[in-house]
């Protein structure tokens, strides 16, 4: 049984037409042309792109209802931001325990980019994700009983 969904900067629709798609289409890390290319690698069939597994924003409340608690994290400067936030709203409307957090000043995938590892947004992403896993899964996480200095040291060792 899945106890928690933890999507980071999720793809939730194949329409490519949200305000964040328009605003960040050419000027940030993930561009609209790259996103369209990635969709083409999956399928070029418009019908398949509308299927719920590809575009969960198109799911009905009945299809969404019963999903596990969901903690969505999005980047402010990301073409996927609006659909991630819309997914959080849709899940909540369907009765799912859903939380969406927007991290200001960062781009798509920032939490996985070594050059951005020192940002406070990256640290918040990692620690809040770990805290949610501990809460829903009952597991220990790196920050549970450690000081900021210990976490910084561990982060440096990891890379």
Labelled PLM ranges:
Residues 1-159:
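Alpha/beta-hydrolase superfamily serine-hydrolase fold, recognizing
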């Amino acid at each position: 049984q899945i106890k928690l969904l933890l999507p980071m900067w999720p793809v939730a629709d194949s329409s490519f037409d949200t305000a964040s798609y328009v605003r960040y289409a050419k000027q940030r890390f993930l561009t609209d042309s790259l996103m369209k290319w990635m969709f083409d690698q999956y399928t070029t069939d418009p019908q398949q792109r509308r299927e719920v597994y590809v575009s969960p924003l198109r799911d009905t409340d009945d299809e969404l209802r019963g999903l596990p608690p969901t903690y969505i994290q999005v980047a402010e400067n990301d073409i996927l931001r609006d659909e991630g936030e819309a997914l959080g709203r849709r899940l909540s409307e369907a009765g799912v325990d859903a939380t969406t957090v927007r991290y200001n000043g960062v781009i798509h995938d920032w939490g996985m980019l070594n050059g951005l590892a020192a940002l406070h947004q990256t640290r918040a992403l990692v620690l809040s994700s770990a805290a949610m896993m501990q809460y829903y899964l009952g597991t220990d996480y790196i920050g549970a009983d450690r000081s900021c200095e210990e976490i910084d040291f561990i982060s440096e060792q990891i890379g």
